[in-house]
Curated annotation (Swiss-Prot):
Catalyzes the second step of glycosylphosphatidylinositol (GPI) biosynthesis, which is the de-N-acetylation of N-acetylglucosaminyl-phosphatidylinositol. It is a single-pass type I membrane protein. It catalyses: a 6-(N-acetyl-alpha-D-glucosaminyl)-1-(1,2-diacyl-sn-glycero-3-phospho)-1D-myo-inositol + H2O = a 6-(alpha-D-glucosaminyl)-1-(1,2-diacyl-sn-glycero-3-phospho)-1D-myo-inositol + acetate. PANTHER family: N-ACETYLGLUCOSAMINYL-PHOSPHATIDYLINOSITOL DE-N-ACETYLASE, N-ACETYLGLUCOSAMINYL-PHOSPHATIDYLINOSITOL DE-N-ACETYLASE-RELATED. This is N-acetylglucosaminyl-phosphatidylinositol de-N-acetylase. It comes from Homo sapiens. It is linked to Coloboma, congenital heart disease, ichthyosiform dermatosis, impaired intellectual development, and ear anomalies syndrome: An extremely rare autosomal recessive multisystem disorder clinically characterized by colobomas, congenital heart defects, migratory ichthyosiform dermatosis, intellectual disability, and ear anomalies including conductive hearing loss. Other clinical features include distinctive facial features, abnormal growth, genitourinary abnormalities, seizures, and feeding difficulties.
Length: 252
């Protein structure tokens, strides 16, 4: 028991040490800067519901801003599972404004083809057609979305991955268009916040974004825009989830 306690303390000290290094510079020098992720790209963030952009992808959005990416956002539903669609669309726009995504670059799909419902399977080909249209119209050269695990396992998240995976494997994406997927982690790693940083550094192969303290506050402010969703367990999520601080992503 004592050994476990000492291990937790050591991990905490190590993690906060890493954070100090990131906070000490004006701009974090992340792995993506020396890898395959260039500057000034036109990036499309593809999400399933309003609040995905803040709950899961805030480190990516803010990290891309450091690299001067022009970020577009495509949300495949209005989040109307509890008949709150109109409210949630407004909350999404407020959150995007906090994260620095131009409102003119935000597209929300609100139709019966893509219901906010974990029990409904979205048609992969239909999702892929809509996605490809937005990629081509906006001249996108980087697509960011969920991986096969969908982070939370939500079927709508996984449907987005299936669609972009199909476009990629079938060679339908425009030349020079890459795909990044957000790594799903186990429940323990998901809820240890910054303590996951050493593991993220060890296991991330392609792109790693880690927020400094100022950026974490910005991410939390974006999440707080989704007032209709701030139930007690989501407030705990904001405090403990690694996804409010850390995003590790892989190229297809």
């Amino acid at each position: 028991m004592e050994a476990m306690w000492l291990l937790c303390v050591a991990l905490a000290v190590l993690a906060w040490g890493f954070l100090w290094v990131w906070d000490s510079s004006e701009r974090m020098k992340s792995r993506e800067q020396g890898g395959r992720l260039g500057a000034e790209s036109r990036t499309l963030l593809v999400i399933a519901h309003p609040d995905d952009e803040a709950m899961f992808f805030a480190p990516t959005v803010l990290g891309l801003a450091r690299l001067r990416h022009w970020v577009y956002l495509l949300c495949f539903s209005a989040g109307n599972y509890y008949n709150q669609g109109e409210t949630r669309k407004k909350e999404l726009l407020q959150s995007c404004d906090v994260l620095g995504i131009p409102l003119s670059s935000v597209m929300i799909i609100d139709n019966r083809d893509f219901p906010d419902d974990p029990g409904m399977q979205w048609d992969t080909e239909h999702v892929a057609r809509v996605l490809l249209q937005h990629i081509e119209v906006n001249g996108i050269n980087l697509v960011v979305t969920f991986d096969a695990g969908g982070v939370s396992g939500h079927s709508n998240h996984i449907a987005l991955y299936a669609a972009v995976r199909a476009l990629h494997s079938e060679g339908k994406l425009p030349k020079g268009c890459s795909v990044l997927t957000l790594q799903s982690v186990n429940v323990l790693r998901k809820y240890i916040s910054l303590l996951d940083l050493p593991l993220s550094l060890l296991h991330t192969q392609d792109v790693l974004f880690v927020l400094n303290s100022k950026e974490v506050a910005q991410a939390k402010k974006a999440m707080s825009c989704h007032r209709s969703q701030l139930l007690w367990f989501r407030r705990l999520y904001i405090i403990f989830s690694r996804y409010m601080r850390i995003n590790s992503l892989s190229f297809l």
